[in-house]
Amino acid sequence: IKDADLQEMIDSSERQIKNLANTIKTILITSKASESKLIINKEQIDIIELTKQAQEQIDINYASKPHAIGIHDHREENALVYADKYLIENVMHNLMENAVKYSDKEANVEVNIKQDEHFTIISVSDHGVGIDKKYQKKIFEQFYRIPATHHKSGYGIGLAMVKYAVKAHGGT
């Protein structure tokens, strides 16, 4: 085996291991939350840095798919956020990954971070076809997948985890 081929095999294995680890994390979070056993360990976190770390992982995992993720901090200052780093990192990763994964062509994803009087508001959007209204509530149910997306990899647990983690932080 040539060195370049060996390195590609190692890189591919590392990506697959990280993907499996993320899937296991999501399953554990969702399982604990559905049994009301989810423990929140809040600390001060830099939400921009956390979002950039999730973006870097997505950039690696989706290197062969054209995409761009823009992270926009609209707060007056880069204030720290009091949240569970582990949960919020998984939320950000899942939302951005879904935006890239389910875009048919080039995925242009926008992450906007704003601050109101009491909360940090995070929105993740893309310019894809959107989600049909009849599925918009169902997609947050554990193991639910929109029928037209079954050709993509996934288990229907990511958005359930997002819902549980966001609710645990007092969000919607």
Can you describe what each PLM-predicted range is?
Residues 170-172:
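Conserved glycine-rich
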Residues 12-20:
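Short alpha-helical segment of the dimerization/phosphotransfer core of two-component systems
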Residues 61-72:
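Short conserved segments within the C-terminal catalytic ATPase subdomain
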Residues 35-40, 78-83:
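Conserved micro-motifs of the catalytic ATP-binding
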Residues 131-143:
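Short conserved segment of the HATPase_c
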Residues 99-100:
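Short helix-loop "hinge" at the ATP-lid/N-box region of the Bergerat-fold HATPase_c
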Residues 41-56:
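A conserved beta-strand-to-alpha-helix junction within the catalytic ATP-binding
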Residues 166-167:
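Detector for a conserved hydrophobic position within an alpha-helical segment of the HATPase_c
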